[in-house]
Structures are given as structure tokens and as C-alpha cells.
Swiss-Prot record:
ATP binds at residues 304, 358-365, 415-416. This is PAN2-PAN3 deadenylation complex subunit PAN3. The keyword Cytoplasm applies. Residues 529-567 form a coiled coil. Residues 568-660 are annotated as: Knob domain. The N-terminal zinc finger binds to poly(A) RNA. Contains a pseudokinase domain. The protein kinase domain is predicted to be catalytically inactive because some of the residues important for catalytic activity are substituted and it lacks the equivalent of the binding site for a peptide substrate. However, it has retained an ATP-binding site and ATP-binding is required for mRNA degradation, stimulating the activity of the PAN2 nuclease in vitro. A motif (PABPC-interacting motif-2 (PAM-2)) lies at residues 59-79.
Length: 660
């Protein structure tokens, strides 16, 4: 491409037009990269009034808007001509808008005729002499009425009289509504002096990263055995973040909701069910789950409300006769049932069935974990090792249930089994089927006998268990291959090239779905060897948690020491105390505080070394005899002192303070 260098220097570079910059600007690009200013030059205030008329005409023709252009006056319509005949084409005669109520008449009168220079006004883009808009006071008016809403009233304003009618109906299940309820709004009544601004309670973001996270393993610098970094002094970031989120979920509240304030001994109801289904597919009745707090012990619980309506009329204690048995079942893989009762607290013409369980914050169901993704979550892939863990844990739960002459029944469903921790599942919703099906169960017991009926229910549990594990394993197959009979699904899992299940696991699926009638025998034949691996992993997890707990064990000791320092330093009553002056014996405490937190490096930047702070505080708390140098801020005075001497001075000052 041939470029004329003489003409190219006056041509604007297209790279700047297209991309905003030219990467060859300083590397030999021949085109121009200088952006020409497009702003017009305003006329000078001291310009000569006798300017050439032709020059003014040309300047006015180049302008897009000309203030000297007269207003449009139609002459063909008589009525409109008379209406607009009084308008003046001169800008200085146009009245200035002054809002009513913004200022007194005396003040606004002087603004109606601002002084303007004819030679200056047409060239100004913005007229500085135009008065600024002053909104009217919403509380003061000549006629004691609010003629127009003020911009201030656009905020969330409510009055005591309108607060009850200002509640906005909102869906408590939508994310963000639980922590951020919609603010109420109402129009302020005339002559009302009690208007106040109601701030909505919004959920604040959790400060998970209180310190810098650990770098990826591939970027981690190997350290000698005698060196450690800051991250090794605290629990891992993922574990800390998980615990913080659980704590936040436990303490979450929902103010100004339509839910009842109290249900029996429980209060502070917060919806935690994320299924968005009013009718439960398991119970075939409206069912909702809430997090509540107990008035008795103050602990959080999960409250399930079932609208039994006319399906079941509970008039006595007979439907709850198995609740006492369920409360006695203690198993690590079962969500503990607390109590069951009926209540009219939710309104309506029928009472609701209320069943409360232990609460596990931020727990997912197996359906949310692997099938239907929860809002903001990710689906966990199915692996053979994960399924072995599920089989062992659910088998443990079923054995405990069957030994107490009970049956899991509706609890063996993907939407009722909770994943409370990594590879940790618990059967939830136990005991509800015994209440809802009480009348039918009594008829079956009279026909078959109690033992035969219980044995039948327990065999149904085993079949549901096998079907549940098979459905989870079938998630590894394509969608069109999952809707088959159990025998066909097992054959597909065995012959599929995309699934790598071992023969041992295929035999387990076959035995569980075809032949098993006794869980104890199934446990001995198929799970005995796998249980040893499960116990080993559980003990490794226990050792990990214990090691993390040991790293946090001494945090309270350091916190108490920092609290003492802040109690005694910079108190107002010590301003004139000679002991806290530069020559006083307690001035060392201030120097030690500066030595720990107010250090600067050789470049004048603050030193924020957490390991150094912890090291010095640990030495101070231990009271060792190590001596070091303390220097004041102007570096004119210095003192050599030991940690033991400083600790004694701090203890003495704190005792003096507490004695008062």
C-alpha cells in the first residue's frame, strides 16, 4: 500500500476512530493522532459593539441554535395569533421560573429581572445568572396543602397512621427478599409533623476475605521446614467461609413479614424452602419449611408446616402416638425430630400440622445437590465413591429406624434427604407419614396385624432405598436412557462405555433392587469392607477439624491482651497524669503499642505484618525476659525494656482501672 507521507500527516488515523487508540502511534504510523478540539470559542465580553454585520451573519449561520431567532408566531390562525402575540422574541424579557414556596416574595422579586448583556447572552451555552431550582418545603404551604410531591418525599416515607396499610406483598422465597424486605411507602397526610424516614433493612455482604487468600498451589513458594506463612496460622479460607455463611443463615431474620410472630413456643419465622412448589409431591399437600427459634432454649429449629385441610381431622393425640418413638431415635444420619402439634397461627379455617426438627443451615437436599440446581449453586457430579458413602450412611439410618419398629416411608425421597456437609447425608422429614396416614394405617393393622404391617413397610423402605441409589447412578447416563425399569437400567450401567462403575457396585445395585430383604445381611455381604474405608475417611476428617481447632485455640488469649491495651491507652482522664507522660513509667505501654502497630519500612510505607504482631503479642503474654528497643515518634528518646516488664506494667494499669 502506497501512502503519501505529505497528505497522511493531515489525515486522522482510523485506528483511533475504531479502537480508540493506535498501537503503532510511536512505532512509525504516518497518520495524525491529534484530536482536534470541537468546542466553540465563546465571544469576548469586551469585544467591540460595532462588529461587522456580515461577520455576525456568517457566525450565526454556523451555529446550530441561535438565541436571536424570533419565536414562532403563526399568522393563519387568528385565535393562536392573539394568544401568542404578547410573547417577545428577546431572551432578556422571558420570565424566569421561580418555584413557589422556595423563598419569600422579597427574595424572588429580585430574580424576575436578571441583568444580561445583549452581546454576551447569545454566545453563552449556560447562563450563570439563572437562579438555581429551590424545591418547596413539603411541610410549609400557604394553603396548608401539599400541591405536588417533593423530591424528598420520593424516598420511603411512612406515617404512624399509614404504616399498617403500607405493607407490600412479596414472595419470601425469592433470593434477597429474606434479608431485604420491600420498604413501605405512604403519602404524607396534610398538617402532619410526625413524618419520619423508614430505612429498609438490607442484607449486607459478608466480609469473607478478612485477609489475603492463599495463592493457588502451583504459585505457592516452597518454604523451608522452619518457616511458615500467615495462612498456616488460621483455618483454610473455604472452611472459614462455609462457617461464616452458616452463621449468617442461622441468624437471618425476616422483619415486617406476613408470617405469624409466634407458633407455639417458636418465633422469628424465615422461609428456607427453595422448591417454589406450593403442593408437595411427596405429601400431596401444601407444605412449607421455616427456620425458627425456640423460646425455651433459644436454639434454631426447622419447622415444617403442612396444611392438612379436610384430608385429616386431628381431634386427639392418637395420630401422634409414634412421635415419642421417633424422638428416641438417635442416629448421626437422621435429622432429629423434636415435636409435632397442630396450630391455627397461620390463619385459615383449618389447623395446620407442625413438625419441628433440628436445623442444619445452608444444607441441600439430594435433589438440589445433583439434579435441580439451587439458586447460585452448582451440581455435584456423581461418582462411585460418593454413592458408596450414600449407601453406607442411608443403610445406617434405616437399620436404626427398623430396630425401633418404625419405617422411614416418605423420608426416603431425594427431596427429603439432606446433605449437611461434604459426603454427609441425613434422612429428614421422618414421622410425617405416620401422622398423615394414621387412619389408613389403623385399618391395615386391624386386617394384617401390627407386626406384619410393620414388616411390609420396612420391605417397602428397602425397595425405595434401592430405587433411590439407582436413580442417582442413572444420572451418569444420557437423559433418554434413564426412564427404564431397574433391571434394564442396571444392564445399561454395566455395558455403558461412558460410565466406569466397578463390578462390585453393579452387584450391589442388583442385590439392592432385586433380592435384598434384610438390611443386616446386606450390610454383612456388601458393605463390611467398604465401611472400613468410610471409617478411615471419617477419622481423617476428625483429625483435620481437630488440628484446625488447635490453631484457633489461643485466639481468645491474644484477644484479651489487645482488649486490655485498648482499655488503658488514650483514656481522657490520663491526659494530665504524669505517669502517662513521656517521663512516666506507663508511657512504655504507648511506645509498645506504636512498636507493634505503627511501624514503617525504609520506604516510608506502613508495615502490615500479621505474623510479627502475633509473635510480639505472644511474647508479651508469656512475659519472657527478651529485651528490645522502644523509640518514640520523634526518635529523640529510646528505652531498652523486656516483655516481662511491659506485661507487669499493663497488668498494674488494668488493675488500677478496674478498681476504679
Amino acid at each position: 500500500m502506497n501512502i503519501n507521507l505529505d497528505s497522511a500527516k493531515d489525515t486522522f488515523c482510523k485506528n483511533v476512530l475504531i479502537y480508540g487508540y493506535c498501537k503503532y502511534e510511536n512505532k512509525g504510523c504516518a497518520f495524525s493522532h491529534t484530536v482536534k478540539p470541537t468546542s466553540s470559542v465563546p465571544g469576548s465580553q469586551g469585544s467591540n459593539a460595532t462588529t461587522n454585520s456580515s461577520g455576525n451573519t456568517n457566525a450565526d449561520m454556523k451555529k446550530k441554535f441561535n438565541f436571536n431567532t424570533p419565536s414562532f408566531q403563526p399568522s393563519t390562525v387568528p385565535n393562536l395569533t392573539n394568544k401568542f402575540s404578547n410573547l417577545s422574541p428577546n431572551l432578556k424579557e422571558i420570565p424566569v421560573f421561580v418555584p413557589s414556596g422556595g423563598m419569600s416574595n422579597a427574595d424572588s422579586g429580585g430574580m424576575n429581572e436578571p441583568e444580561m448583556n445583549d452581546s454576551v447572552t447569545p454566545n453563552k451555552k449556560f447562563n450563570a445568572s439563572t437562579p438555581s431550582f429551590m424545591p418547596s418545603n413539603p411541610y410549609i404551604s400557604n394553603n396548608d396543602q401539599i400541591s405536588a410531591p417533593s423530591p424528598v418525599m420520593a424516598q420511603s416515607v411512612s406515617t404512624p397512621g399509614a404504616k399498617a396499610n403500607g405493607n407490600i406483598q412479596h414472595n419470601p422465597y425469592l433470593p434477597g427478599n429474606a434479608g431485604t424486605p420491600q420498604p413501605t411507602s405512604a403519602v404524607a397526610a396534610p398538617n402532619s409533623a410526625d413524618v419520619f424516614f423508614q430505612q429498609p433493612t438490607s442484607s449486607y455482604p459478608l466480609q469473607h476475605h478478612l485477609y489475603a487468600p492463599a495463592p493457588p498451589p502451583r504459585l505457592t513458594i516452597p518454604l523451608p521446614p522452619h518457616e511458615i506463612n500467615v495462612n498456616s496460622m488460621f483455618i483454610p479460607n473455604d472452611l472459614r467461609e462455609t462457617l461464616l455463611k452458616r452463621n449468617e443463615a442461622t441468624l437471618q431474620t425476616l422483619p415486617r413479614s406476613n408470617l405469624p410472630d409466634h407458633v407455639n413456643i417458636y418465633h422469628s419465622l424465615v422461609p428456607i424452602d427453595t422448591s417454589f412448589e406450593n403442593i408437595s409431591k411427596v405429601y400431596e399437600l401444601p407444605s412449607f419449611v421455616y427456620k425458627v427459634f425456640s423460646n425455651v432454649d433459644g436454639n434454631p429449629y426447622a419447622l415444617r408446616k403442612i396444611d392438612i385441610q379436610s384430608v385429616l381431622r386431628i381431634t386427639n393425640e392418637l395420630p401422634f402416638k409414634y412421635i415419642k418413638k421417633w424422638k428416641s431415635v438417635k442416629c448421626a444420619n437422621i435429622v432429629q425430630l423434636q415435636e409435632a402439634f397442630t396450630s391455627m397461627a397461620f390463619g385459615g379455617s383449618y389447623s395446620s400440622l407442625i413438625v419441628t426438627y433440628d436445623y442444619f443451615p445452608n444444607s441441600n437436599t439430594l435433589q438440589e445437590q445433583h439434579i435441580s440446581r439451587r439458586l447460585g449453586g452448582k451440581l455435584e457430579p456423581i461418582t462411585e465413591e460418593l454413592l458408596w458413602n450414600y449407601v453406607i450412611e442411608i443403610t445406617n439410618a434405616l437399620i436404626n429406624i427398623h430396630e425401633n419398629n418404625l419405617a422411614a416411608r416418605s423420608a426416603l425421597h431425594l427431596s427429603k434427604i439432606l446433605v449437611t456437609n461434604k459426603n454427609r447425608v441425613r434422612l429428614g422429614g421422618v414421622g410425617i407419614s405416620d401422622i398423615l396416614n394414621y387412619e389408613d394405617d389403623e385399618e391395615q393393622i386391624q386386617q394384617k396385624g401390627l407386626d406384619a404391617f410393620r414388616h411390609e413397610l420396612q420391605q417397602a423402605d428397602i425397595k425405595k432405598f434401592g430405587k433411590l441409589i439407582l436413580d442417582l447412578a442413572a444420572l451418569c447416563l444420557p437423559n433418554n436412557a434413564r426412564n427404564h425399569e431397574p433391571k434394564d437400567l442396571i444392564s445399561l450401567l454395566k455395558t455403558s462405555t461412558t460410565v466406569n462403575f466397578s463390578g462390585e457396585f453393579i452387584n450391589l445395585l442388583t442385590e439392592l433392587n432385586m433380592n435384598t430383604s434384610d438390611l443386616q445381611e446386606f450390610n454383612r455381604n456388601h458393605l463390611s469392607r467398604r465401611i472400613l474405608n468410610f471409617c478411615s475417611n471419617a477419622q481423617d476428617s476428625q483429625d483435620f477439624m481437630e488440628s484446625q481447632l488447635s490453631t484457633e485455640l489461643e485466639n481468645a488469649r491474644v484477644f484479651r491482651l489487645i482488649t486490655k491495651l485498648n482499655f488503658i491507652i488514650d483514656r481522657p482522664e490520663y491526659d494530665n497524669d504524669p505517669n502517662w507522660q513521656e517521663n512516666g513509667n506507663k508511657y512504655i505501654i504507648k511506645l509498645f503499642r506504636d512498636y507493634i502497630f505503627f511501624q514503617y519500612d525504609e520506604f516510608g510505607k506502613p508495615v502490615c505484618d500479621l505474623s510479627r504482631v502475633l509473635t510480639n503479642l505472644n511474647k508479651l503474654d508469656a512475659g519472657i525476659d527478651e529485651k528490645f528497643l522502644l523509640v518514640n515518634k520523634d526518635e529523640k528518646n529510646c528505652i531498652i525494656v523486656s516483655y516481662k516488664e511491659i506485661r507487669d506494667i499493663i497488668d498494674s494499669a488494668f488493675r488500677t482501672l478496674t478498681r476504679g
